[in-house]
């Protein structure tokens, strides 16, 4: 629904404020409320350093070329990725911890609305050009409410690399969380499931070193109050 130009146009008339939050992992904490257009928010302490290392070690043997929505290999995304499920004995506890933090922030606790966690590795020169995590015009519109990604919790598993920031292109904001920290942003409207221009973002090219991140996606459910 929103391309890069539409996103830029929207934000020329929008007042956008970066929301920096230092949140505890207390499950009793109320859901993070963000006003339209759902500015990205920093999230501190999602994982420990040891958990980041373990998740990387678990994902490494199964890495494959990253794909875009529709299971397509594209020059727009040149990283490698692996999927990790909450049921896996060696790393499932880490997936569950990431999901729990995403649930705490979004107010969504239904397991069926969480995808597997996607672990991504970016080597030198690798990137993910500006894109939306939600379903775009090429998707099956009839299935869109079921498959659309409502929110993204992006966790940085390393921070010892050069460049490679997450760039929210429409508002000109670059973020580079510390290892174990993340950024939360909404991809779709809570009521309609339509894509939000605020979520347009890119993984900029890594200059040197290796960047590892983990994506946790919460899907849109038109019957739910928040997602």
Regions found by a protein language model. Give the residues of each.
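Fe(II)/2-oxoglutarate oxygenase catalytic core
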Residues: 1-227
């Amino acid at each position: 629904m929103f391309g890069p130009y539409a996103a830029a146009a929207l934000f020329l008339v929008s007042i956008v404020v970066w929301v920096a939050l230092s949140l505890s992992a207390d499950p009793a904490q109320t859901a993070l409320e963000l006003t339209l257009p759902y500015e990205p928010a920093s999230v501190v302490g999602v994982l420990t350093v040891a958990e980041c290392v373990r998740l990387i070690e678990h994902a490494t043997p199964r890495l494959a070329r990253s794909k875009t929505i529709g299971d397509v290999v594209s020059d727009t995304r040149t990283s490698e990725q692996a999927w990790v499920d909450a049921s896996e004995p060696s790393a499932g506890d880490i997936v569950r911890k990431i999901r729990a933090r995403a649930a705490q922030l979004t107010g969504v606790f239904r397991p069926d609305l969480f995808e597997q966690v996607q672990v991504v590795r970016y080597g030198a020169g690798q990137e993910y050009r500006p894109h939306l995590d939600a379903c775009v015009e090429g998707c099956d519109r009839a299935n869109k409410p079921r498959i659309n990604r409502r929110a993204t919790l992006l966790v940085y598993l390393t921070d010892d690399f050069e460049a490679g920031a997450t760039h929210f292109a429409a508002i000109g904001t670059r973020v580079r969380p510390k290892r174990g920290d993340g950024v939360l942003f909404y991809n779709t409207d809570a009521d309609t499931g339509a894509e939000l221009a605020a979520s347009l973002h890119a993984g900029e090219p890594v200059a040197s070193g290796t960047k590892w991140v983990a994506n946790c996606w919460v899907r849109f459910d038109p019957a739910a109050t928040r997602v």
